Amino acid sequence: MPGDHRRIRGPEESQPPQLYAADEEEAPGTRDPTRLRPVYARAGLLSQAKGSAYLEAGGTKVLCAVSGPRQAEGGERGGGPAGAGGEAPAALRGRLLCDFRRAPFAGRRRRAPPGGCEERELALALQEALEPAVRLGRYPRAQLEVSALLLEDGGSALAAALTAAALALADAGVEMYDLVVGCGLSLAPGPAPTWLLDPTRLEEERAAAGLTVALMPVLNQVAGLLGSGEGGLTESWAEAVRLGLEGCQRLYPVLQQSLVRAARRRGAAAQP
């Protein structure tokens, strides 16, 4: 007897799958407010990109790629005298374009369609934090493009994207004043609200306020600040900034080692 190929021939009975997902909850009071999640960084991961970097911070995974410099869109612009250090005048400075995308499988909850308002806001924050560190005057009439892809959102996604993007720019050989290191913070609610460094996704969802700090560690200059929510008095926000800057300084050696390892791999590959 011929079978009916138009029907789904599944089993007559089914059983619900067992859930073995890791429990991200922490017992109240056991969380060290200054702890950083384990970090793994690798530069030069993509062979087809001018520069690339992959970063893991706990459950957060970000992949960044850099392309360019290439001629900026909009045609030729008029010339002018060169500035100090051989840089182009302000009117001819290069441009830094940033794109932030979230993979469909990045989080448990369904997100807005790609290219939505949230992704555009994060891309703009990425651009504003990276621009102070890049010597755009050395790339007249050109544009550099940075693409960040969030593979898994385990918390502090913007901070991880900032760090990975700066690492990718350095891997591409782009002239920079300094690297940019990002750190996220969240204000845990309760009778005695406490700022938590490098929060997880669940900690961000429960937080009364959030803050992302971007630091150029060698120059000791803040490249960007982005806060939201109700963080209380000014002293509370100042404490959060101080905690975030300390976290950025602690992450900086990890990026240095990643760039050194990438340079050694390139040197070994270039040898006959």
Swiss-Prot record:
Sections of the chain in a coiled coil: none
Signal sequence interval, chain numbering: none
Pfam families: RNase_PH (PF01138)
Stored InterPro entries: ExoRNase_PH_dom1, ExoRNase_PH_dom2_sf, PNPase/RNase_PH_dom_sf, Ribosomal_Su5_D2-typ_SF, RNase_PH
Localization per Swiss-Prot or TrEMBL: Cytoplasm; Nucleus, Nucleolus; Nucleus
Sequence similarity: Belongs to the RNase PH family.
Complexes and interactors: Component of the RNA exosome core complex (Exo-9), composed of EXOSC1, EXOSC2, EXOSC3, EXOSC4, EXOSC5, EXOSC6, EXOSC7, EXOSC8 and EXOSC9; within the complex interacts with EXOSC1, EXOSC7 and EXOSC8. The catalytically inactive Exo-9 may associate with the catalytic subunit EXOSC10/RRP6. Exo-9 may associate with DIS3 to form the nucleolar exosome complex, or DIS3L to form the cytoplasmic exosome complex. Exo-9 is formed by a hexameric base ring consisting of the heterodimers EXOSC4-EXOSC9, EXOSC5-EXOSC8 and EXOSC6-EXOSC7, and a cap ring consisting of EXOSC1, EXOSC2 and EXOSC3.
Name of this protein: Exosome complex component MTR3
